[in-house]
């Protein structure tokens, strides 16, 4: 069967040919998660429904675009064979994301003991009188899988890394808003504590200044009274009072 014959097949032909007697093919649609400049692979599974060896051959309308491994082979009785179809990296994406490429799987009963190396094109020749079973496969493009969401390091062990989703689908937004509110509340609490500490220190400093001023006034008054009452040396009580005032001032200044 030529490439022109493959293109001319309709969906009705596909439905009729999918009811195979020799090989069951899964899937009938080759789905490629299309990405530019990246090779993409898709697996075909061929299951032999008979008690005979079945030789197969895979053909495509666009052989330069796809690599099929193996493209020929033998499926043993009541067994399954995997065929890997790889689409070469594409430089441009189709405008409508539609693919017109098609594949054709041919199957024929083979002699007992035949190997994959012994499969020849003549085995699939209808002109030679061989009964060839054919299954047409379509190619479709699908969206590539999304990358997984990153897991936050701060999540607790055993808990889900994703935020719980409510009925309206906005659970992650609510969790994010709650996170912002909690951070603001903690920041405001820390700010309030800092303000209270600053206020307390300011009040203590003002009290120390007032006490210092009062002691200074009392010291000046004692000096004046001392000058009036005594003309000689410095009285012992005066020296004691000055020393006491110095100790008090030193203690206060150390606290502030």
From Swiss-Prot:
Record has Membrane as a keyword: yes
Composition-biased stretches (Polar residues): 157-169
MSP domain location: 22-142
Any one cellular-component term (Gene Ontology): endoplasmic reticulum
Transmembrane domains' residue ranges: 233-253
Cytoplasmic compartment spans: 1-232
Modified residues (N-acetylmethionine): 1
Modified residues (Phosphoserine): 149
N-acetylserine modification, residue list: 2
Keywords assigned by UniProt, alphabetized: Acetylation, Coiled coil, Endoplasmic reticulum, Host-virus interaction, Membrane, Phosphoprotein, Transmembrane, Transmembrane helix, Vacuole
InterPro entries per record: Ig-like_fold, MSP_dom, PapD-like_sf, VAP
Coiled-coil blocks: 187-232
Membrane topology: Single-pass type IV membrane protein
Subcellular location: Endoplasmic reticulum membrane; Protein storage vacuole membrane
GO BP of this protein: intracellular transport
PROSITE patterns: MSP
Region (Disordered): 142-169
Subunit structure: Homodimer or homooligomer. Interacts with the cowpea mosaic virus (CPMV) NTP-binding protein (NTB). Interacts with NET3C.
Functional description taken from the UniProt entry: Part of a membrane-cytoskeletal adapter complex that forms a bridge between the endoplasmic reticulum and the plasma membrane. Associates with microtubules.
Protein family per UniProt: Belongs to the VAMP-associated protein (VAP) (TC 9.B.17) family.
Descriptive protein name: Vesicle-associated protein 1-1
Organism of provenance: Arabidopsis thaliana
Name of encoding gene: PVA11
